[in-house]
Amino acid sequence: MEDKWRWSLVAAVPPVLWGSTYFVNAHFMPADHPLWGSALRAAPAALLLLAVTRRLPHGAWIWRSALLGILNIGGFFLLLFIAAQLLPSSVASSVMALAPVALTLSAWALLGQKPSVVLLIGAAVGAMGVPLLVGVGTVGFEPWGLAASLTAMLMNSIGSILARRWQGEIPVLHTTCWQLLWGGAALVIAAVVVEGAPPALGPSQLGAVAYLSILATAVAYLCWFGALRHIDAGVVGVVGLLNPVAGVSLGILAGGEALAGTQWLGLAIVLGCMAAVQVMPTRHPALNGEPAEREPGD
């Protein structure tokens, strides 16, 4: 149980950092260059981790990291960009709140992690609390935006589980670096094609890029994939509901925003579901993946 709580705390780091990106992007990054904003998150993070690992993908990990880089980084960020153009942020957050359910079901199908009733209920009820928290109203939205948001959520859920399935004995630092390399390259190409040259950045914007790339991307993804190796994917997914919690909290603390009564109710539901899945019994199912793979020279 102590190990589960420790890794649950690690799993809480990514959604908190990702939740802060809404505020940082809105206040510091150029609003008319969203693709370059995404590329400037992924590419420097990849190069930073590559400088540490000094290893490029090899063997089966060439195509694996390319696929995972598109699912978890490149394609994921691109679809989020499309969704952000077509959907209110509250609707997009509510769609992404379905990720715990998608992660749980993907882990069941690909890893053999049969979810408990408590986990399924916690994931579903927690997802229902997010629309209350972010204040979804009756505003209309584009079907294509909804499709982009749903596809992004499913891609990231499946990509996260595949990363766990294929982990072998390759260090998480290496596999995370390789995914960011492929995803970052795809984003840079997309940014050049769609938006042209990168925007000029001032000191505050360079500071924002450093925060987004080092903390909200490199550190966040290392913690995300590390936690997935040690605790059930469904638990990681439910902890991921801290994403909108962090975003709303930062808006209150730094933006002077106030919560309505229904938003407090949504916050209580999300936090209650997170607490419920932490106290359920821990299972250690065998992985239905490929044989363990070692680094050359190990």
Predicted features along the sequence, with ranges:
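Glycine-/small-residue-enriched transmembrane alpha-helix faces in small-molecule transporters
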Residues: 1-39, 138-165, 185-186, 288-298
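Juxtamembrane helix-entry segments on the extracytoplasmic side of multipass membrane proteins
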Residues: 3-8, 31-35, 39, 57-63, ...
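Transmembrane alpha-helices of multi-pass small-molecule transport proteins
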Residues: 7, 30-75, 102-106, 155-162, ...
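Specific transmembrane alpha-helical segments of multi-pass solute transporters/efflux pumps
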Residues: 17-22, 50-96, 132, 213-231
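Hydrophobic/aromatic residues within transmembrane alpha-helices
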Residues: 28, 37, 41, 83, ...
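Specific alpha-helical transmembrane segments that line the substrate/conduction pathway
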Residues: 36-47, 77-114, 119, 149-152, ...
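Helix-helix packing/entry segments at the starts of transmembrane helices
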Residues: 38-40, 73, 77, 92-98, ...
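Hydrophobic transmembrane alpha-helices of multi-pass small-molecule transport proteins
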Residues: 43, 49, 106, 115-135, ...
